[in-house]
Amino acid sequence: MGPLWLDVEGCELTAEDREILAHPTVGGVILFARNYHDNQQLLALNTAIRQAAKRPILIGVDQEGGRVQRFRDGFSKIPAAQLYARSDNGTQLAEDGGWLMAAELIAHDIDLSFAPVLDKGFDCRAIGNRAFGDDVQTVLTYSSAYMRGMKSVGMATTGKHFPGHGAVIADSHLETPYDERDSIADDMTIFRAQIEAGILDAMMPAHVIYPHYDAQPASGSPYWLKQVLRQELGFQGIVFSDDLSMEGAAIMGGPAERAQQSLDAGCDMVLMCNKRESAVAVLDQLPISVVPQAQSLLKQQQFTYRELKATERWKQAYQALQRLIDAHS
């Protein structure tokens, strides 16, 4: 597997998609709502992606729940993370949410959902109800349960957005936010605890600048990724960049410069989404390399959607989560 994640055009592969997927620098494909029409089509698309790559490749999606759920019709509704803490049995429901989300993706030959959000607080426009809580203990309690659910069915976990995106109001999809606080120790407590618990397989840093600490966005900062994440916190898993086509990454230069800076800073894999010319520029200019440890993120189970929906576990989780959503809609 190479270090670059990119997207494909639609519900079926184009000739250009196939050519690009065969490039050795490509290590992953991230899917969007436009890639989904129905369950059978999605399964066929993922089979075609793996065949075109001619080698192991990761397939991922943002399917964390609430407003960030790319596949809707034909999939169970997953609650927004904020809802779990509002229920008496929220810990079990959070575990059900992680399990159900992961199981349904695995049944469609998808390896990863980039989840969960470990950011604290609801004020940031980009985060909002994607956060599990606005205090450290609430985030730890419910994110841990959600990740237990994911891992129990064979999906790796990705914590985001290190070292904490929740306190900035600006949206890093649209601009580069600055977190002007003197200390982000509270936010860091969450990431530290989940690393020490050994429950995180991958990490996604924020396109946020913390000027009190460093002048670069965390996603392109050796200080945050090498010194803090790797050395001080001892994180051993895969580090993804967030989408480098987002405006929050523009401060790092053009597409190839962004990718190279992120890799040099300590990212293992980089995402370049929804701008094909940018992805091609990275393929053309990035030296060919492999990320052997990324194979550990491939899904650990295999079953069909029909088999999954026939289980009592699926029926119980589906009904419990639907009741939670209905109670707060």
From Swiss-Prot:
InterPro entries: Beta_hexosaminidase_bac, Glyco_hydro_3_AS, Glyco_hydro_3_N, Glyco_hydro_3_N_sf, Glycoside_hydrolase_SF, NagZ_Beta-hexosaminidase. Transmembrane segments: none annotated. The gene is nagZ. It is found in: Cytoplasm. Monomer. This is Beta-hexosaminidase. Optimum pH is 7.0. Optimum temperature is 45 degrees Celsius.
